[in-house]
């Protein structure tokens, strides 16, 4: 019984260590709420906006076309 518990604890700790070392929680934690800037995409298309934001601000950024008065602007958020 004790060997089984030790094995389960060791396996759980090993899996947590692997999960943290691969930065999976950071990748999933992208909330896209913090405004980082704008990208000059005209006309604003979601794919082009996202590509521009990633190229300008880094991989952890997501780009979204958002209405600003009468125009669509490409906003980059983290």
UniProtKB/Swiss-Prot annotation:
Record keywords, A-Z:
Antimicrobial, Disulfide bond, Fungicide, Plant defense, Secreted, Signal
**The organism sits in which domain of life?**
Eukaryota
Instruction: Provide one Gene Ontology cellular component.
Output: extracellular region
The record's disulfide annotation reads 44-65, 49-74, 53-76
Q: What is its main location?
A: secreted
Question: What is the residue range of the signal peptide feature?
Answer: 1-29
Statement: the UniProt record of this protein carries the keyword Signal:
yes
Presence of the UniProt keyword Protein biosynthesis in the record: no
Q: Which GO terms describe its biological process?
A: defense response to fungus; killing of cells of another organism; response to salt stress
Q: Where in the cell is the protein located?
A: Secreted
Q: Name the family.
A: Belongs to the DEFL family.
Q: What is this protein called?
A: Putative defensin-like protein 202
- Organism listed in the record: Arabidopsis thaliana
């Amino acid at each position: 019984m004790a060997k089984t518990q030790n094995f389960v604890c060791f396996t759980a700790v090993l899996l947590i260590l692997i999960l943290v070392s691969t930065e999976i929680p950071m990748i999933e934690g992208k909330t896209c709420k913090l405004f980082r800037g704008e990208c000059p995409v005209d006309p604003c298309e979601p794919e082009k906006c996202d590509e521009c934001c990633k190229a300008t601000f880094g991989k952890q950024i997501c780009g979204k076309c958002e209405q600003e008065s009468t125009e669509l602007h490409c906003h980059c958020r983290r």
